[in-house]
Curated annotation (Swiss-Prot):
The keyword Nucleotide-binding applies. It catalyses: 7-phospho-2-dehydro-3-deoxy-D-arabino-heptonate = 3-dehydroquinate + phosphate. It comes from Prochlorococcus marinus (strain MIT 9515). This is 3-dehydroquinate synthase. Catalyzes the conversion of 3-deoxy-D-arabino-heptulosonate 7-phosphate (DAHP) to dehydroquinate (DHQ). GO terms for biological process: amino acid biosynthetic process; aromatic amino acid family biosynthetic process; chorismate biosynthetic process.
Length: 363
């Protein structure tokens, strides 16, 4: 068994995640091996920066295997994760003549992946798509699990669908082109997995020499943390594909993080930076409610900060915080649900948190 091939086992539409150095240079071969024939048109969706780095090489490789393929770039940045970008992809799909046998490839970070996935879910009522994530955050989180969406002015990811990719191909080499701020932001999601389900991963991340290797983009260390993160997510998604139960724990830090992203203006904080602050708030609430030890909370905060991530909450109007939280997808029957830690490697879902218990962190 190849330890860097991870199956996401679902009742329908199971698929493989392959992690391999250099895999981005052999996507044509990979597609043929999973049964995608070269009679299918392919539209690669990316952004200009990523396309300049990897697009031509990917396109040439696909053409080597006689695929008819083109690249279409959307604008980069969270503020462009919207219906306008979605429509641009639809227009490109129409111009290129994508039928129901066609394939979309998302080449880029989480924004490209989310928008492309939603385009695939909705173009001609659904066509296949592949994820080739190029950021750490998209590798360990958004490329796996089938959540696709665009933002609405009233909230993040409010317009979307659960729609699984046919495959995910991860090349750690692409991280060497990533700005260090974005790499560190991706580490927030890796730390999240340690807190919610994988104590061993958390302890691995705490060790100084491991942190040094990770931040220096050591290939073996990167593959290890990507692999462990995806295995945790795959397990959770396999138990609850549509987020009716346990999958909600993957949103640890996200309720407060989305508030910060929205109210500070998309782009002021990177997604992972906002999530790191959200985890800090959730940890503090848990400490106050005696759900976990103060020592655990301090360990979490120290780990977050050791990877260069923020923990200081920005000043935000309390009324606006409630407005955004009540529009959150995790609200059920008018009640806000929060993911709070009970120990390193264990969290639970709570709906009995009073407003006063979290609003004070936004003073």
């Amino acid at each position: 068994m190849n330890k860097n091939k991870i199956i996401v086992p679902l009742s329908n539409n199971s698929y493989e995640v392959t992690i391999r150095q250099g895999i981005i240079n052999s996507i044509g071969k990979e597609l043929t091996q999973i049964g995608i024939n070269n009679n299918r048109k392919i539209l690669i969706v990316s952004n200009k920066e990523i396309s300049n780095l990897f697009g031509s090489k990917l396109l040439n490789d696909l053409k080597k295997y006689n695929f008819s393929a083109e690249i279409f770039n959307i604008k980069a940045g969270e503020s462009y994760k919207n219906l306008a970008s979605l429509r641009e992809i639809y227009d490109a799909a129409f111009e290129f003549g994508l039928d129901r046998n066609a394939l979309l490839i998302a080449l880029g970070g989480g924004i490209v992946g989310d928008v492309t996935g939603f385009a695939a879910a909705t173009w001609l009522r659904g066509i296949d798509y592949i994820q080739i994530p190029t950021t750490l955050l998209s590798m360990v989180d958004s490329s796996v699990g089938g959540k696709t969406a665009v933002n609405h002015p009233k909230g993040k990811n409010l317009i979307g669908a659960f729609y699984q990719p046919k495959a995910v191909f991860i090349d750690p080499e692409t991280l060497k082109t990533l700005p260090i701020r974005e790499f560190k932001a991706g580490m927030a999601e890796v730390i999240k997995y340690g807190v919610i389900k994988d104590k061993e991963l958390f302890e691995y991340l705490e060790i100084d020499k491991n942190r040094e290797k990770i931040l220096n983009l050591d290939n073996e260390s990167l593959i290890k943390i990507i692999n462990k993160s995806i295995r945790t997510k795959s397990y959770i998604v396999s138990k609850d594909e549509k987020e009716n139960g346990i999958r909600a724990i993957l949103n640890y830090g996200h309720s407060f993080g989305h508030v910060i992203e929205n109210l500070c203006g998309y782009g002021e904080y990177l997604h992972g930076e906002a999530i790191s602050i959200g985890m800090k708030i959730a940890g503090d609430i848990s400490t106050e409610k005696n759900l976990w030890l103060k020592e655990d909370s301090l360990r979490q905060d120290k780990l977050i900060e050791s990877y260069g991530l923020p923990t200081q909450t920005p000043k935000i109007k309390k009324h606006d915080v409630i407005t955004i939280l009540m529009g959150d997808k995790k609200v059920r029957d008018g009640k806000m649900r929060f993911i709070l830690p009970k120990g390193i490697g264990e969290v639970d879902i709570f709906n009995d948190i009073k407003e006063s218990q979290f609003l004070k962190y936004f003073d």
